[in-house]
Amino acid sequence: MSAPPKENIGLPVSEFVQMNNLACESVGGKVLFATDDCFAPAENLLKKKDPEFKPGLFTEFGKWMDGWETRRKRIPGHDWCIIELGVPGIIHGFEADTRFFTGNYAPRISVQAACLKPEEITFQPRKDKIGTAASIEEYKSADKLKSEKWSHLLQMTELTPGYAESSHSYFNVNSKQRWTHLRLNIYPDGGIARFKVYGIGQRDWSSCKPNDLEDLLSMVNGGVCLGFSDAHYGHPRNLIGIGRACDMGDGWETARRLDRPPVLKADSKGILQVPGFEWAVLKLGHPGLVTHIEIDTNHFKGNSPNSCKIDACALTPTEEEGVKRDERFEIGYNWKPLLSVTQIHPHKRRYVESTSLALHQVISHVKITIAPDGGVSRIRLWGFPRPLP
């Protein structure tokens, strides 16, 4: 069990942890600078996979740890690193995971942020840094950014040791600005296993021409998961990830439904006649007119759904604010069919052209329903950005 969430002003933890991890290595997040990487490099902070512990495994510098761990500080100051977000955007919360760092965790952290231009970054690529501290040249590159003056998104606050019942600490952020880089400060030294940055990607849509075809649902373009019925094996936010899924864990997968019939039957089109289904609701990065859809079950060879349908609606931000507290996303959502019930197949991409779509108007939200259960790796909604009517 996680430690009780630490909340401030902003979204509750239960909402922001459904959002995208803007700093994950799988979406391009990377560490540009770290004061020290003695026991374990800062790059481990951004790994997508959960941290692991290997008893008895040591490097030439000390115990092998799956996280960022600095040396015991014996000089003035504290340790910190600079992280470049893989997807710039609006940040709603942080998660600091100290798992397995029990007697060596960082007792306090703070987080600062900046919105930088590419030409402001002058760091050389980091190589294998274990056992080292930052060089004079690396400090010079860091000093140019004046990161100590960046905006504080999280003031200094305490973490908890990396035991199973206390390793996760959550912090919400009340900021509407777009950020590209973070400075993670640890006080004074120690280790953190993972650092997640929950938020919504934000791109400059003003540069997009009316006839530019875009994936309106992609996390890079600001798509975000708002809710779902089940995420037993994989979260539906993975549906809008970058590129094709790397494995089954990089998709949305539900548990097997217990209400499925003892003997399955199908109609003449091969659609299973089952009572149950699973769903996920997502918000497009920009309202738009969808022209074709891609449903990808890559890697799901024995556990893909039998069928999928997609409903859509158009909501202004004010309307969305008024209805989003309905946990089933039914009250206040005027759902209309976008894609009727369609059979899908294991480990394949299914393309649906415009002529097969049931709705040809601007939409802002979609509800993806699969039956009876199973896994989908990606959903792409290709179309043209348009303002809401």
Swiss-Prot record:
EC number(s) on file: 3.5.3.4
Superkingdom in the source lineage: Eukaryota
Pfam families (alphabetical): Allantoicase
Alphabetical keyword list: Hydrolase, Purine metabolism
BP GO annotations: allantoin catabolic process; purine nucleobase metabolic process
Pathway as given in its UniProt record: Nitrogen metabolism; (S)-allantoin degradation; (S)-ureidoglycolate from allantoate (aminidohydrolase route): step 1/1
GO molecular function ontology, one term from the record: allantoicase activity
Catalyzed chemical reaction(s): allantoate + H2O = (S)-ureidoglycolate + urea
Family assignment from sequence similarity: Belongs to the allantoicase family.
Protein name listed in UniProt: Allantoicase
Species assigned in the record: Xenopus tropicalis
